[in-house]
Amino acid sequence: MLTPFKLFTKIFKNRNDRVLLRMKKVVDMINYMEKDIQKLNDSQLASKTNEFRKSIESGVKNLENLLPQAFAVVRESIKRIFNIRLFDVQLLGGIVLNSRCIAEMKTGEGKTLTATLPAYLNALSGQGVHIVTVNNYLAHRDAINNKPLFEFLGLTVGINLPGLSASMKRAAYTADITYGTNNEYGFDYLRDNMVFVPEERVQRGLHYALIDEVDSILIDEARTPLVISGPSDDTSLLYSKINELVFSIIQKNKRNIDNLQKEEYFTVDEKSRQVILTENGLVLIEQLLIKSGIMNQGESLYSSDNIILMHHVNAAFRAHILFTCEVDYLVKNGEILIIDEHTGRVMPGRRWSDGLHQAIEAKEHVTIQNENQTLASITFQNYFRLYEKLSGMTGTANTEAFEFQSIYKLDTIVIPTNRPMIRNDFPDIIYMTEHEKIEAIINDIKDCVKRNQPVLVGTISIEKSEIISHALSQIGIMHKVLNAKFHAAEADIIAQAGYPGAVTIATNMAGRGTDIILGGNWRAEITALHKANTCKILKIKSDWKKRHHAVLKSGGLHVIGTERHESRRIDNQLRGRSGRQGDIGSSRFYLSMEDSLIRIFASNRLVNMMKKLGMKSGESIEHPWITKAIAHAQKKVENRNFDIRKQLLEYDDVANDQRRVIYEQRDKLLNISDISDIIRNIRCDVVEKLFNIYIPLEIIENKRDVMKLEECLEKDFCLELPLLKWIEVEPRLYEEKEILRQRILENMTQKYEHTRKIIGIDIMCSFEKEIMLRTFDVLWKEHLASMDYLRQGIHLRGYAQKDPKQEYKRESFSMFTKMLDHLKYEVISEVSKLVIELFNKKESILNSTNKYNDFQSINTQVMNTKLLSIDHFLNQHTLTKNKTVSRNDACPCGSNKKFKECHGKIVNKRH
């Protein structure tokens, strides 16, 4: 009997069904046009692209009006080039992707070709389409495979891969459709906002992004920011010393536990992945630090002077206890390579932050690289929200539909499969111990091999995959292993995982991107042949049909999960490798009470129930209730991870607003040839600020304040003004300080105009832009570091009954305002130091000795960096140099000091 809710749903349909019903009408229109499109010859079909583009340019039609006809053209082109006719469900997927939504399409439903539909349509506007994949292999494969289609239709295709030169990247982005990875798109965006010449940028705007495996990129990797960094101070020796001390404490703690002693030095919180020192642990580490000379007698590890030491100690404990080799990372060629916890892939070039990577390098006794300082950063969440139009596709999105909507404003639409799903998903089997579970898995594999059924075994770490591999080797079962150690042969291994009796062990199947075809991949076999004649091809196809039939008879691909992942979505991705395109298949997960998910997150009720049953060694429980209990534990973890990602975004949104302001201002600077008006406005603000600092009251009450202002103008702006004399001569200035302010501004402006006249407007403009851009970058880098420090400690405000998020927003805004004020001050200060005396009106502007060939403006404590030399610009403008500056001449910087006492001193130090 139908419940009222089910009856209501049956009559009115759910939202997903209603959306698909509406889109089905568009599919009917595409099918209706198919006959007319089929009548066109190749030339007429290809010319449709120009016809569509003219319609858009003239404003007669927009993309939505063109969709049915454009999709019909792409479908017919695919049929002619690849001999494949797109299913109606693929057309539905294309419509969903064009509608700023996420399309959930099951494995094997043809997502790669589906993506060509919205990619073609959106490329017609000429603004570029970015197709985003999870790795370089997929980006290259999809671009090469789809290139014949797009080129037939008159569109260009680019591939954006790491290691390409700027000109090659620029060419890739200029193409109508660009394939690349999420990392590369994000890093290119950050690099583009660090250039000094507009022509050095590679991207041409963020119009439309279509993300493959969207859940992997927008959810799994949402907590990992993209960071461009530079080297910081060398602290490798300190990491090594602290590593030895922490290792000795861990060993001592282990001995205490083995000897049943109650004294513990630290506790481990696996849920929050933290190691917490106990009172005894704190006393011991302080004693060891003092004994080794790292800390002074009588000091505390928690004193403000030792915050960095505490940071190193925490990193060392986490490295030893929470991070495991061949689970979280690999050691290869003297390097620590991070393993992606979601995909099982190695991530070369990635490094953990906060000193953790250095702590792991110390733990594994490899070369410890310097810590890095952030130069620019952005999260994937905020990067992809910069696109005007965003969509994505994956086989598993519905479980994360709420997060997609709440964070990215993307609805999730589930596309029905072309054929009914007939895979048999068996209930989970749970054992008491890990050993019993492994035994049961091996027995299941043996049974499958006996009946010639292919098996895919999914593990969550390299360590687990090698345990299974070792057990299979001992009983003589041939198998292949796919993990971070052997990822180079990934596509070949997966392509042939459907062979009769094949056993494939894979670590985290998420995002592998290659379908498992029952009977093996005959196309891959043909491609592997150097010279494929018709007879060989026919034999390969004939053999494949026999193998395909044998696999179907044995039950199709059997998927074994060695434990549940934290996310149900990853489990569904593993299961989804079986039962593609209506194929028969099966899946089962084997669990034990020692699995981390059950041990950390499962409810006490489940654990107690297992104990009460009094299970004997080797016994197992198989019941839907167990599966539901595990799913509930996974949901708890998913909700917790969602809260973490949401909180991360809320904090990053603060930095993102500031990043947007900085990048917009920087972009504006790059595109203006003459920024003298900007300098003029900034100069007014700086003089106003100076007065507010040194003479805050309405009237001048203290001559000492005026003297300090006078000293500041001379030191920071090379402006010698007799302010005290002016006041003595004109007593009214005591009360009318606005007149004094205006006079200072006029003198500063006159000095500036004089400098422009001497140097030349073009050179001065180049200087000003260079100074402003470099000051932007240096202060932004320091601001990011300050924001990071603020973020790390802001949670402590909660103890004072204050909202940490509101406090973070308030303080970061205050810091940002101060940074902008500092920026103005530094720019005007540096520009003011560019005063150059005219030695010869008709000859050169600046002449120097051979040693003095790298004249630079004075470094300040804040900038601590060298600005581009005047000589560089003079050479660019073909100015000659033939007069020598002697040691006793006035320094050409305009400081009125002798050259030997000013920049001559700097030159001598440098040489």
Curated annotation (Swiss-Prot):
Induction: Repressed under conditions of excess protein secretion capacity and derepressed when protein secretion becomes limiting. This is regulated by SecM. Keywords: ATP-binding, Cell inner membrane, Cell membrane, Cytoplasm, Membrane, Metal-binding, Nucleotide-binding, Protein transport, Translocase, Translocation, Transport, Zinc. It catalyses: ATP + H2O + cellular proteinSide 1 = ADP + phosphate + cellular proteinSide 2. GO terms for molecular function: ATP binding; metal ion binding; protein-exporting ATPase activity. Its cofactor is Zn(2+). It comes from the Bacteria. It is a peripheral membrane protein. It is an enzyme of class 7 (translocase). It is found in: Cell inner membrane; Cytoplasm. One of its GO terms (biological process) is intracellular protein transmembrane transport. Its EC number is 7.4.2.8. May bind 1 zinc ion per subunit. GO terms for cellular component: cell envelope Sec protein transport complex; cytosol; plasma membrane. Pfam families: P-loop_SecA (PF21090), SEC-C (PF02810), SecA_DEAD (PF07517), SecA_PP_bind (PF01043), SecA_SW (PF07516). Zn(2+) binds at C891, C893, C902, H903. ATP binds at Q90, G108, E109, G110, K111, T112, D515. Belongs to the SecA family. Monomer and homodimer. Part of the essential Sec protein translocation apparatus which comprises SecA, SecYEG and auxiliary proteins SecDF-YajC and YidC. HAMAP family: SecA. Part of the Sec protein translocase complex. Interacts with the SecYEG preprotein conducting channel. Has a central role in coupling the hydrolysis of ATP to the transfer of proteins into and across the cell membrane, serving both as a receptor for the preprotein-SecB complex and as an ATP-driven molecular motor driving the stepwise translocation of polypeptide chains across the membrane. This is Protein translocase subunit SecA. It comes from Blochmanniella pennsylvanica (strain BPEN). The lineage of its organism: Bacteria, Pseudomonadati, Pseudomonadota, Gammaproteobacteria, Enterobacterales.
